[in-house]
UniProtKB/Swiss-Prot annotation:
Taxonomic lineage of the native organism: Eukaryota, Fungi, Dikarya, Ascomycota, Saccharomycotina
Protein name, UniProt field: Vacuolar membrane protease
Molecular function per GO: metal ion binding; metalloexopeptidase activity
InterPro entries membership: Fxna-like_M28_dom, M28_fam, Peptidase_M28, PFF1_C, PFF1_TM
Membrane topology (Cytoplasmic): 1-36, 377-384, 437-446, 496-539, 594-598
Topological category with respect to the lipid bilayer: Multi-pass membrane protein
Main EC class the enzyme belongs to: hydrolase
Chain residues that bind Zn(2+) 1: H157, D169, E227
Function text: May be involved in vacuolar sorting and osmoregulation.
Length: 837
């Protein structure tokens, strides 16, 4: 070799050596280059950060601090003691313990300005249902420094259901009111505050209805209702009447809110109601602050002091203390969209969000369509129909995997169900999109997929915007569409700067390398084609979208997953939520899914297989997440215990009861509509000293109608119901019986101490609630006789008691630890009598 040749070779080697990138550059390329290993790292980090932030945001222990000031410490200690005393026993309206709670509260407030509300009300509480109620609310008024401001009502109910100690529902609300009362006793508020410790919320919101008739109601402009539909945890802002009042919640120290639950009420996904409904319908503006999970302990004996903590109580109480110090309320009365994250509160009128949505819906198609035209026509981006088949095909197949195995499993293992479903959805997308990628010649299938996902979000956003004010919980769709569409738009803009093949590559190249197995082919392309734009696209789309979807979806699922026990319709709804949740969790990573490496695919396959197998093998209920059964014992012609629950579970529980085995009682199980069943049996454990006597009074005929009356004697009783044949009874009266029904006006009226209600469409049921334990009920009514009878009418009377039920004590004591019990009716036992009038 000549000296010149040696010199040239040395020069070339030196040039190659000097052109080698340094360690930093190689590190950046290995992390941000579009390689399977890089994507795996990004995905793992996204999962860890998303789950970690969501866990922190929803954690009571990590986000709420106990008070440090001496006054607030004393208030919390006193209120916690109040809660322990209030929830010592179940204290339903029909129990003596209810009177004890009333007297306990009255003793605390006796030195303040208060009124032992004795309103008697009568109103139509449902279609064909009329209710008569005697109230014993406790009202307290603390006058503010500015008498020109409308008063603020704070409300909580001190009754429980007969099957629960009522700690969360609503002992913590009552204890929080007492805490606020002690606070304002030391710090005069600016506006007058009226406290309504109301009774009998559980069976018809009666305490709230009674307050609306009280003279103090006229002072009130705003309200804060404190409730509980779970058992401890964090108190969430369930709903607000309007933006003007909702935005004041941003001033509390520990805001925790989402308008998703508000939409759940508006769309009737959440069926239970609170006093909020009464106050809103009466024209007040306010908020509903409540504990919301877990619902399988709601209204059961598990709603007890052991399952809550002072920190839960302090969360509700401290926010109430802060809220009562609000200043002037904005006049805006349109629905509000609101949420919190990491303690930061955000609220906006629904109209403002709608305007943003309209701009986004119009702007992105208008901008992206010309760009797409230019790219395809002048930049030679080759697209085929097959490019656009992947996402819709995979989405359709993924919907089919909504329910895996045991349908009840979501009640106790929601994370397992979501993880299994999501893993299967990811695998479906992975297989389908890799197939599409294999047959396509497109040089940027990733951007095509981004555009398709953007279109999916666009369609959803159109629906959300068109639906209007009832859809205040779908604000996350705006965020999802914005980040996805913006990133797609950036990709299209990058393509417009791409030179036709043979030219120089742009800074944001649309070119995407083809790859083989694992990472070896990721390094085969020249350095100019490392494609770092994918990391920017990933960071713009996936972290924000994943956090929005995961945090919102998990909040919804934790709030409603227990309702799968309530009906087949609820089961279908829950699994629809799971499928939608999984789809939206996966959509942000769909553009990058073909780059998943073998370890992610293997891990997802293991999760899917193990999840499916466990869903078939694991019992759906356990001590921590029990099944709820509902109990009522009816005493009358056929003394029977009735237990209601989902089909397939009730008989096994009851067959092991001692009274059933010893008496060889026959279990009679009957399938009910919507996936429920009722099992009945005769119990030897009959309650004692429960008597109902019904006597009739003379009747009279007038203008074709017949008037009659009955007297109901039910010692130690507060609650009875009179059932009439459908559509025949046109008027009812509680009090003295009279014959002048023709002169009675439609609706409610009061005459000489009698409470009268007339409805020409017919009254099928009259509910009676009284305070005097031993006073008889006197009920008159007017009815229209059938053509084929002699004018008589059979009336059924059922009176309820909330205690003294040995059969209920037996089922609680001997049932498995994965079962909890709740009341089916207003009491645990009902005594039934029939009388011909």
């Amino acid at each position: 070799m000549s000296e010149e040749e040696v010199h040239d070779t040395s020069s070339e080697a030196s040039e190659v050596f000097t052109n080698q990138p340094n360690a930093f550059v190689r590190g950046v390329r290995s992390i941000f280059g579009y390689r399977k290993t890089s994507l795996t790292l990004f995905v793992i980090l996204t999962i860890v950060v998303t789950a970690g932030l969501s866990f922190y945001d929803n954690s009571l222990e990590l986000t709420i601090e106990l008070p440090t000031s001496q006054l607030e410490k004393e208030i919390l200690e006193s209120s916690w003691l109040d809660l322990q005393n209030i929830a010592r026993y179940p204290h339903t309206y029909g129990s003596r313990a209810n009177d004890q709670v009333h007297d306990y509260l009255e003793e605390i407030i006796q030195d303040m300005e208060y009124d032992n509300d004795g309103e008697k009300i009568m109103f139509e509480s449902g279609k064909g249902v009329v209710s008569y109620y005697e109230s014993n609310n406790l009202l307290v008024r603390v006058n503010g420094s500015d008498g020109t401001l409308p008063a603020l009502l704070l409300s909580a109910h001190y009754d429980s259901v007969p099957s629960s100690f009522g700690v969360t529902d609503d002992g913590m609300g009552v204890a929080s009111l007492l805490g606020v009362l002690r606070f304002v006793a030391h710090n005069q508020p600016r506006r007058t505050i009226i406290f309504n410790f109301n009774n009998n919320e559980e069976f018809g919101l009666f305490g709230a209805h009674a307050f609306v008739k009280h003279p103090w109601f006229k002072q009130v402009g705003y309200f804060l209702n404190l409730e509980g539909t779970g058992a401890g945890g964090k108190a969430v802002l369930f709903r607000g009447t309007d933006y003007g009042i909702v935005k004041n919640f941003g001033g509390v120290r520990y805001p925790y809110a989402t308008s998703i639950f508000q939409q759940g009420f508006n769309n009737h996904v959440i069926h239970s109601e609170t006093d909020y409904k009464v106050y809103k319908e009466a024209g007040l503006r306010g908020l509903d602050l409540a504990f919301y999970k877990p619902r399988d302990k709601y209204h059961t004996g598990e709603d007890n002091i052991r399952n809550v903590s002072p920190k839960s109580l302090w969360h509700m109480m401290s926010n109430a203390i802060d809220f009562v110090q609000m200043g002037v309320v904005d006049d805006s009365e349109e629905p509000a969209v609101y949420t919190t994250f990491l303690g930061y509160f955000f609220a906006t009128p629904i109209s403002a969000l709608a305007r943003v949505n309209l701009v986004l819906l119009v702007l992105f198609p208008v901008v992206s369509t010309p760009l797409l035209f230019v790219i395809v026509k002048y930049k030679k981006w080759k697209l085929r129909v097959t490019n656009f088949l992947g996402v819709p095909l995979a989405m359709g197949l993924a919907v089919a995997v909504g329910q895996v195995g045991n349908p009840m499993l979501v009640s106790s293992h929601p994370m397992m169900v979501v993880a299994t479903t999501t893993s299967i959805v990811v695998l479906v997308y992975y297989v389908v999109l890799n197939g599409v990628d294999w047959v396509n010649t497109s040089s940027d299938q990733k951007l095509v997929t981004m555009i398709e996902v953007s279109f999916v979000y666009w369609v959803v956003l159109v629906y959300v915007t068109w639906s209007g004010g009832d859809h205040t919980g779908e604000f996350g769709v705006t965020v999802l569409f914005f980040v996805q569409a913006s990133t797609s738009l950036l990709g299209l803009i990058g393509w417009t700067f791409t030179r036709v093949r043979g030219g120089d590559e742009p800074l944001l190249s649309g070119e995407e390398e083809r790859y083989g197995t694992e990472d070896e082919r990721d390094t085969e392309k020249p350095l100019v084609e490392h494609n770092y734009d994918w990391s920017l696209q990933y960071l713009l789309i996936v972290p924000v979208s994943s956090l929005v979807v995961y945090n919102s979806g998990w909040l919804v699922l934790e709030g409603v997953n227990k309702t799968v026990q309530e009906s087949l319709a609820s089961e279908h709804l829950i699994y629809w939520i799971v499928v939608v949740f999984s789809q939206f969790l996966v959509l942000p990573v769909v553009p990058f899914i073909t780059k998943f490496n073998r370890y992610i695919v293997l891990g997802l396959s293991v999760v899917a297989v193990v999840g499916v197998l466990m869903s078939m093998a694991v019992h759906p209920f356990n001590q921590g997440s029990p099944m709820k059964l509902r109990f009522i014992e009816r005493v009358g012609q056929n003394d029977m215990v009735e237990v209601y629950g989902r089909q397939g579970f009730v008989e096994d529980v009851l067959s092991d009861l001692p009274s059933v085995k010893q008496t060889q009682a026959k279990l009679e199980c009957e399938a009910l509509p919507d996936g429920l069943e009722v099992c009945k049996y005769k119990s030897g454990l009959t309650p004692g000293n429960l008597t109902v006597e019904v006597t009739t009074e003379p009747r009279a005929e007038s203008y074709g109608l017949i008037s009659g009356a009955i007297t109901i004697a039910a010692p130690e009783n507060r609650m009875c119901t009179v059932h009439f044949p459908p559509d025949r009874v046109k008027a009812v009266v509680v009090g003295k019986f009279g014959n002048n029904f023709k002169a009675i006006p439609d609706g409610f009226s009061r005459e000489k101490g009698n409470y009268i209600y007339k409805d020409r469409n017919g009254i099928s049921q009259l509910e009676l609630y009284k305070l005097d334990w031993n006073k008889d009920y006197h009920v008159g009514f007017e009815w229209l006789p059938d053509i084929d009878d002699e004018g008589g009418m059979r009336v059924e009377v059922e009176c309820f008691w909330g205690d003294m039920v040995p059969a209920y004590q037996e089922v609680v004591h001997y049932s498995p630890n994965w079962v909890t019990w709740a009341n089916k009716e207003r009491g645990l036992v009902g005594v039934v009598k029939h009388v011909d009038v």
